[in-house]
Amino acid sequence: MSNWLVDKLIPSIMRSESQKSSVPEGLWHKCPSCEAVLYRPELEKTLDVCPKCDHHMRINARTRLDIFLDEDGREELGADLEPVDRLKFRDSKKYKDRLAAAQKDTGEKDALIAMSGKLQGMPVVACAFEFSFMGGSMGAIVGERFVRAANVALEKRCPLICFSASGGARMQEALISLMQMAKTSAVLARLREEGIPFVSVLTDPVYGGVSASLAMLGDVIVGEPKALIGFAGPRVIEQTVREKLPEGFQRSEFLLEHGAIDMIVHRAELRPRLANLLSAFTHSPSPVSA
């Protein structure tokens, strides 16, 4: 019996374990909505939208800009800017340590990426929040990158688009982060005065100081399906008012029904829909489909 264990069974188990470990990590993904197990390469083809239930999964900022902008002519804006712990802030952890961890995990310097480029041949400037970087919170660098993006849009007289995904202002930067609400709102007022279109795309989730400033100041406000959008979270509101909130409260569909946003657009339709919309706004020729 012992010879059989040594000669047959143990090698068989070891081969099985070896085969398991040879399967690359991240090859399969479970949908958080319907729990279907999805093959990652196939999921990427659907832009991280579940083919079973149409749930729009969260995607990182670079992926979002990659699928939105044309491949040619992209230029990143404000890539040299890095956050500084001016207040030497510390809660359960030092702010500088939180920044270092977020930078290591995401490969980004901060929570907003801005690029100039083209949308189906039309010059645009686009920004996207990186929610994985400290919850997409808005601090000095996020505000400054957004302002630089808006200034490039002013200079080129081309539309500005921002994909928001944020928990709000970055508490570790205190008043500096709150100032970004006024700073971003002020530059958007300049765009409006100059007749430059600003489209705000609300993805899951958008809360706090970002929803109370730039995210809700679009000439057109677009929501992704079932995105959570609000100022305070539903749990906080329920605890405050001591009442049960309506079904679907703070979902993009609820906001559309109550006039807080203008439209809901499926991720796969976003490029052509926004290209046609911006073409009409800017009196440009119809965009080239791509």
Swiss-Prot record:
The chemistry this enzyme catalyses reads: N(6)-carboxybiotinyl-L-lysyl-[protein] + acetyl-CoA = N(6)-biotinyl-L-lysyl-[protein] + malonyl-CoA
- The EC code for this enzyme is 2.1.3.15
Q: Which SUPFAM superfamilies match?
A: ClpP/crotonase (SSF52096)
InterPro entries with a match to the protein in the record: AcCoA_carboxyl_beta, Acetyl_CoA_COase_Trfase_b_su, ClpP/crotonase-like_dom_sf, COA_CT_N, Znf-ACC
Q: How is the cofactor bound?
A: Binds 1 zinc ion per subunit.
Subunit field text:
Acetyl-CoA carboxylase is a heterohexamer composed of biotin carboxyl carrier protein (AccB), biotin carboxylase (AccC) and two subunits each of ACCase subunit alpha (AccA) and ACCase subunit beta (AccD).
Function field: Component of the acetyl coenzyme A carboxylase (ACC) complex. Biotin carboxylase (BC) catalyzes the carboxylation of biotin on its carrier protein (BCCP) and then the CO(2) group is transferred by the transcarboxylase to acetyl-CoA to form malonyl-CoA.
> Gene3D superfamilies under this entry?
2-enoyl-CoA Hydratase, Chain A, domain 1
Alphabetized UniProt keyword annotations: ATP-binding, Cytoplasm, Fatty acid biosynthesis, Fatty acid metabolism, Lipid biosynthesis, Lipid metabolism, Metal-binding, Nucleotide-binding, Transferase, Zinc, Zinc-finger
Family from the record: Belongs to the AccD/PCCB family.
Q: Start and end of every CoA carboxyltransferase N-terminal domain?
A: 27-290
Biological process GO annotation list?
A: fatty acid biosynthetic process; malonyl-CoA biosynthetic process; negative regulation of translation
From the UniProt record, report the name of the gene that encodes this protein.
Answer: accD
Q: Where is this protein localized, as stated in its record?
A: Cytoplasm
| Name by which UniProt lists this protein | Acetyl-coenzyme A carboxylase carboxyl transferase subunit beta
Residue spans annotated as Zn fingers (C4-type) read 31-53
GO terms (molecular function) for this protein are: acetyl-CoA carboxylase activity; ATP binding; carboxyl- or carbamoyltransferase activity; zinc ion binding
Pathway, per record: Lipid metabolism; malonyl-CoA biosynthesis; malonyl-CoA from acetyl-CoA: step 1/1
Q: Which GO terms describe its cellular component?
A: acetate CoA-transferase complex
Reported regulation of activity: Inhibited by pyrrolidine dione antibiotic moiramide B (CPD1); in vivo the effects are not seen unless the efflux MexAB-OprM system is inactive.
Q: Broadest EC class?
A: transferase
Q: Which residues are recorded as binding Zn(2+)?
A: C31, C34, C50, C53
